[in-house]
């Protein structure tokens, strides 16, 4: 399916293929993206704890790090944000592109726990891509996310619960409330920004 979308995109012209603009590298937005992804992971933890544990299939060594932290973010962002999101946005609009690209990104990760987390992370990455019009931003965020996940897995904490890591239920509740607040506020701001992007696309099409 992805190959078909790439083919269709090429036929329609390069304007809807992955955008790599250095102007989209906004440090504040990147920091927001990292914080939002971490908060999302904390908020989803009760749900993810009900799903099967994630197997450590990454391996170790330099090649594993390059594959997980460099190659995977690069190729996956080109495919899911650069091709799938852009193609869907051109035909069905901002919201459909945002949701569809995130859903497919989650589905292709297959494992239920990884798929749910990937869908949520995909929503953040999809928004950042449309907000910055640059894959560099999403590649960096994707690499940070994969790097954290890889480090957790190779150190034996890939399936550890936050409450076990902090060692205090009170501290866990405080962290969870903070993460939930960040998730709610950031999610609301993201939806408002997506509505503006939708309006901009509509005005551009009408011009």
Please state what every model-predicted region is.
Residues 1-31, 188-204:
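Membrane-helix interface linkers and caps
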Residues 2-8, 38-45, 57-59, 82-84:
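Short, mixed-charge, low-aromatic patches
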Residues 10-14, 41-52:
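Transmembrane alpha-helix boundary signature
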Residues 17, 21, 31-35, 45, ...:
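Surface-exposed beta-strand edges and their flanking turn/coil or helix-capping segments
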Residues 19-24, 53-60, 90-92:
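Helix-boundary and loop/linker segments of multi-pass membrane transporters
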Residues 28-40, 183:
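Alpha-helical transmembrane segments
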Residues 45, 62-206:
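Transmembrane helix-loop-helix hairpins at the membrane interface
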């Amino acid at each position: 399916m992805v190959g078909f979308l790439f083919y269709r995109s090429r036929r329609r012209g390069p304007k809807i293929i992955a955008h790599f603009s250095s102007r989209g590298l906004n440090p504040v937005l990147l920091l927001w993206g990292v914080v939002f992804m971490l908060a999302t992971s904390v908020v989803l933890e009760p749900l993810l704890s009900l799903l099967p544990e994630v197997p450590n299939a990454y391996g170790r060594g330099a090649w594993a790090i390059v594959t997980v932290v460099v190659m995977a973010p690069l190729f996956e962002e080109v495919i899911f944000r650069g091709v799938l999101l852009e193609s869907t946005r051109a035909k069905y609009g901002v919201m459909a592109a945002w949701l569809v690209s995130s859903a497919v990104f989650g589905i292709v990760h297959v494992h239920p726990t990884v798929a749910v987390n990937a869908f949520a992370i995909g929503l953040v990455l999809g928004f950042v891509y449309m907000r910055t019009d640059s894959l560099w931003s999403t590649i960096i965020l994707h690499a940070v996310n994969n790097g954290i996940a890889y480090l957790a897995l190779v150190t034996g904490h890939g399936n550890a619960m936050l409450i076990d890591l902090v060692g205090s239920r009170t501290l866990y509740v405080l962290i969870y409330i903070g993460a939930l607040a960040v998730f709610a506020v950031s999610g609301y701001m993201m939806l408002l920004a997506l509505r503006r992007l939708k309006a901009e696309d509509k005005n551009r099409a009408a011009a």
